[in-house]
UniProtKB/Swiss-Prot annotation:
GO terms for biological process: protein neddylation. Residues 1-48 are annotated as: Disordered. Gene3D superfamilies: Cullin, PONY binding domain (1.10.238.200), EF-hand (1.10.238.10). It comes from Dictyostelium discoideum (Social amoeba). PROSITE patterns: DCUN1. Residues 8-21 have a biased composition (Low complexity). GO terms for cellular component: ubiquitin ligase complex. Pfam families: Cullin_binding (PF03556). Residues 75-262 form the DCUN1 domain. GO terms for molecular function: cullin family protein binding; ubiquitin conjugating enzyme binding; ubiquitin-like protein binding. This is DCN1-like protein 2.
Length: 267
């Protein structure tokens, strides 16, 4: 909008040419009083991992669960934290004693298949120990509102795994590293391997014999290739070994096992 103000000259009422002072245009620009439009570079950018780390715990929680049921998310977060703190053995970890108490609370044995499934879901790195991050990650995936629901979920997941060969193979691979006590995770003690196989493949056609065979070996450990090949061996070779072919690319350990079974007449 333009407003015109007229200033009269001092001495006369006169004519248009000498009585009319300069006309001043005062223009109010909408761009000067309105909100400044942001340039494309100034528009809000997604929160990066670095920026997320600088947020407060509450801000981080809201960012993490953006678009989800935040009340439910907060409930789960506090539930996981509470359960973890109740079973702590030190400031950061639930150890063997804490896991024993935790298993007692949900009514499952520490050496049960269901607890192995829980460890797999948590991606726990060491047998007998759960870190806070592992614990919260596993519970978040399972989305359980109480310990009773957790037990039901573990039972259900365990049954499904037994009928899903792909996911079971993932669990079987995970179990090797989980059971390994060496830093490289390249081997597992024979006694531990035997017990883990009984847990994973209790009805396998060769599990009982192979566990017994391992206890007779001079070597003290089994490597990952031998471990993985035994799963394939269990799936493809008949209990009586009638279709076993020693010319195939089986590890030497499995050739020796086949000979041992026949010599010991354990078929």
């Amino acid at each position: 909008m333009t407003r015109k103000y007229t200033k009269k000259s001092s001495g006369s009422t006169a004519s248009t040419t000498n009585s009319t002072a300069e006309i001043v245009d005062l223009t109010t620009s909408t761009s000067s009083v309105g909100k400044k439009r942001k340039s494309p570079d100034e528009k809000a950018q997604p929160i990066t991992k670095k920026a997320l780390n600088s947020l407060t715990p509450v801000q981080s929680m809201f960012e993490k669960y953006k678009g989800k049921n935040i009340i439910k998310a907060i409930h789960y977060t506090y539930l996981y934290t509470y359960i973890f703190n109740v079973h702590l053995d030190d400031d950061e970890t639930i150890g063997p004693e804490g896991i024993a108490r935790f298993c007692s609370d949900i009514g499952l044995a520490p050496d049960s298949f269901e607890i192995l499934v829980l460890a797999w879901t948590m991606n726990a790195s060491k047998m007998g120990y759960f870190s806070k991050n592992e614990f919260s990650s596993g519970f978040e995936k399972l989305q359980c509102s109480d310990l009773s629901t957790l037990k039901k979920q573990l039972n259900s997941t365990s049954q499904k795994l037994k009928h899903d060969s792909t996911k079971f193979t993932d669990l079987y691979k995970y179990a090797f590293g989980f059971a390994s006590e060496v830093e490289s995770k390249k081997s597992v003690d024979l006694g531990t391997a035997a017990e883990m196989l009984k847990l994973l493949l209790p009805e396998g056609p060769h599990t009982t014999n192979f566990a017994a065979f391992l206890c007779t070996q001079p070597n003290k450990s089994i490597n990952k290739d031998q471990w993985l090949c035994f799963l394939e061996f269990s799936r493809t070779v008949k209990a009586d070994l009638s279709n076993y072919d020693d010319s195939e690319a089986w590890p030497l350990l499995l050739d020796q096992f086949s000979e041992w079974v026949q010599q010991e007449k354990r078929i």
